[in-house]
Structure formats: C-alpha cells, structure tokens
Design a protein with these regions (language model features):
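Active-site-facing substrate-recognition patch
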Residues: 1-51
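PRPP-dependent phosphoribosyltransferase catalytic core
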Residues: 6, 18, 137-204
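Conserved PRPP/pyrophosphate-binding segment of the phosphoribosyltransferase/PRPP-pathway fold
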Residues: 36-100
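A generic local structural motif
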Residues: 39-42, 63-64, 106-109, 135-139
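Conserved acidic residues
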Residues: 52, 118, 148
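Short His-Asn-centered micro-motif
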Residues: 57-58, 123-124, 154
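Short, glycine/charge-rich flexible loops or terminal/linker lids adjacent to PRPP-binding catalytic cores
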Residues: 74-120, 187-203
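Conserved G/P- and acidic residue-centered "switch" motifs that form tight phosphate/ATP-binding loops
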Residues: 125, 130
Length: 204
C-alpha cells in the first residue's frame, strides 16, 4: 500500500533496528481517512472469503478492525486484556507475551460473540514476533470457528511472526512490509518482493 509506505517514510520515527513509532497517524493519533483506506485494502485482499467476524486485540488494532468490518459489512470483536479470568465468565482466553512491555497477560473474548458458525478474519496494527496474533488464533480455534486469514497494517518481515503463522497454514497479508530499518532509513518489500530503500525525512 504505497500511501501507507509514504506516510511511514514521512512521519514514522525509527528509534532502532526493531522499534518504529507511528503514533502520529496510526496508533495514538489516528488519521481516520487512512484507517478507512486500510479497511478497503483488507476488503480487496480478503473480500472474496465468506467472513462473518473481524477480530483484534485492544487497543491499537481496534480502528483497523472496525474499518475492515465496515468495508466487509460484518461485526468486529476486540479481545480484552485481563490479568485474570474468573471461572464464572463464559469466555475464550489465551495467554499472550508482550515483548514491548515485557509482561504476560490473558486476552479474552466472550463466548456469546464467537462460535463454531463463524468465519473469522484477524486484523492487527503490527506483525512482528507474532505472539499476540497466535493468542487470537488460539481463541478462534477454541471457539471452533474457521480462521480465514490474518491482515496486518505493518509487518516487520525481519522477525519471525509471518513464518510462525504460515507454518500453521494461515494466509497472511500485510499492507506495508519492512525488510529492515535503522535510524534514518527503511527498506520496504514491495508487491513484487523486491526491496525499495526509502530515506526517512529529516526531523522525523
């Protein structure tokens, strides 16, 4: 998605070879027009599938899951982060490790909203290690629903997340695939799987 790559080039802040901040337009302050365009892109990629639900994890994936669900004309669910799940709650849950915050937590989805008849698309903002997405995959599996694919806005392709999901037979699409990055420059993988070196703009 060229417009997304251009925004990352112009406004993204590369703090290290693994840390990219996009909080000025994606996951803190949100460019709503861009978010809706992202939803339309995921519709192009997955719209041929009989999707009944879009699912994500709170909080940074919510706007993109909602935009995608609007484009597809289906509901979306966001898995809630909880320290613990009481036995009285009818939920599906899975443990997730956050490498950013270096903590473990449970993500949960009510059994009222996800079941064996559902055909699910997972949407999230980043694909890196894949830990959070694997948690959602496990929840979909626990619910007996069919997982039709995973869509991520930005992928750090130099990390293991994609292979972790594809090794499970999951279709994965990302709108901006980063091959490598360092302060001052970033390499994107384009649709033809070649590398495009893009210099970060001065002052970003």
């Amino acid at each position: 998605m060229k417009v997304l790559q251009e925004r990352i080039r112009q406004e993204g802040l590369i703090l290290s070879d693994t840390v990219l901040k996009v909080d000025s337009f994606l996951n803190h302050q949100v460019d709503t027009e861009l978010a809706l365009q992202i939803g339309q892109e995921f519709k192009k990629l997955f719209g041929h599938q009989p999707i009944t639900k879009v699912i994500t994890i709170e909080a940074s994936g919510i706007q993109f899951a909602m935009a995608t669900a609007i484009a597809l004309g289906v509901p979306f669910i966001y898995a809630k982060k909880k320290k613990a799940v009481t036995l009285s709650e009818a939920v599906y849950s899975a443990p997730v490790h956050s490498f950013t915050r270096q903590e473990d937590y449970l993500v949960s989805v009510s059994q009222k909203y996800l079941g064996p008849d559902d055909k699910v698309l997972i949407v999230d903002d980043f694909l890196a290690t894949g830990a959070a997405l694997v948690g959602l995959v496990d929840i979909v599996k626990e619910a007996g629903a069919a997982l039709l694919g995973v869509g991520c806005v930005i992928e750090k392709s130099f990390q293991e997340g994609r292979s972790l999901l594809e090794n499970r037979g999951i279709e994965v699409h990302a709108l901006a695939r980063i091959a490598s990055m360092s302060p001052g420059e970033i390499h994107f993988i384009d649709n033809e799987s070649s590398l495009e070196k893009i210099k970060e703009s001065a002052g970003c």
